[in-house]
């Protein structure tokens, strides 16, 4: 993602509706919330998985040196067969090796379900931004979409999960003041 993403905490925001804030800073499982909103018609569509050089903001979020290599997984979280959320999850190669945690085996499973079902993972603070359009897949690319990220840690392993809320989610949730 371009370096112009400005990640903010809740206390750094102004003029955001309480309804949107509730979605952005909900510390529960987004997968579970989306599944409930979709009345069970939820699925994960993998878009990209593999080793890549991590983006500068990702290296900073994982406390690893700039230019570090890591596993990158990009997916859509669908409700009623519409992409509601674009998610990009990354973990540094140095932390993954020997961790026993293999992101490559997830397939169409939700990473969130895995993280929330393993009590050894601790979630760090949630940060939000207006996600740069250049970091989104072409078919959903738009300016000004809300994104959030947080780091899940288990010992030396950190997994940084970023989620971008797409207009189709807000439509389904009946939220107009985005």
Curated annotation (Swiss-Prot):
Q: Which UniProt keywords apply?
A: Cytoplasm, Lyase, Pyruvate, Ubiquinone biosynthesis
Where does this protein hold substrate? 73, 111, 163
Question: Where would you find this protein in the cell?
Answer: Cytoplasm
Q: Does the keyword Acetylation apply?
A: no
Keyword Cytoplasm in the entry? The reply is: yes
GO terms classed as biological process: pyruvate biosynthetic process; ubiquinone biosynthetic process
Q: In which pathway does it act?
A: Cofactor biosynthesis; ubiquinone biosynthesis
- Gene3D superfamilies the UniProt entry points to: Chorismate lyase-like
Might you report a single GO cellular component term? Answer: cytosol
Which coarse location class describes where this protein primarily resides?
cytoplasm
Q: Which reaction does it catalyse?
A: chorismate = 4-hydroxybenzoate + pyruvate
* SUPFAM superfamilies in the cross-refs: Chorismate lyase-like
Question: What EC number is given for this enzyme?
Answer: 4.1.3.40
| Any Pfam family the entry gives | Chor_lyase
- Please indicate which superkingdom the organism of origin belongs to: Bacteria
Q: Which GO terms describe its molecular function?
A: chorismate lyase activity
Classification via InterPro entries: Chorismate--pyruvate_lyase (IPR007440), Chorismate_lyase_/UTRA_dom_sf (IPR028978)
* PANTHER family per record: CHORISMATE PYRUVATE-LYASE
Protein family: Belongs to the UbiC family.
* Its job: Removes the pyruvyl group from chorismate, with concomitant aromatization of the ring, to provide 4-hydroxybenzoate (4HB) for the ubiquinone pathway.
User: This protein is called what?
Assistant: Probable chorismate pyruvate-lyase
Task: Name its species.
Answer: Pseudomonas aeruginosa (strain UCBPP-PA14)
């Amino acid at each position: 993602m371009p370096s112009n993403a400005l990640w903010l905490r809740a206390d750094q925001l102004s003029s955001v509706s309480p309804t949107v804030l509730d979605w952005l800073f909900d510390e529960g499982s987004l997968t579970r919330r989306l599944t409930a909103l979709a009345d069970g018609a939820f699925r994960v569509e993998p878009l990209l998985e593999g080793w890549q050089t991590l983006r500068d903001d990702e290296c900073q979020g994982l406390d690893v040196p700039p230019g570090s290599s890591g596993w990158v997984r990009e997916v859509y979280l669908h409700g009623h067969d519409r992409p509601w959320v674009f998610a990009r999850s990354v973990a540094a190669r140095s932390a993954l090796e020997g961790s026993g945690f293999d992101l490559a085996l997830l397939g169409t499973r939700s990473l969130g379900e895995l993280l929330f079902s393993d009590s050894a993972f601790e979630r760090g603070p949630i940060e939000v931004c207006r996600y740069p359009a250049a970091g989104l897949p072409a078919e959903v690319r738009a300016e000004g979409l809300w994104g959030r990220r947080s780091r899940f840690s288990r010992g030396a392993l950190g997994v940084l999960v970023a989620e971008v809320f797409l207009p189709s989610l807000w439509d389904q949730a009946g939220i107009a003041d985005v």
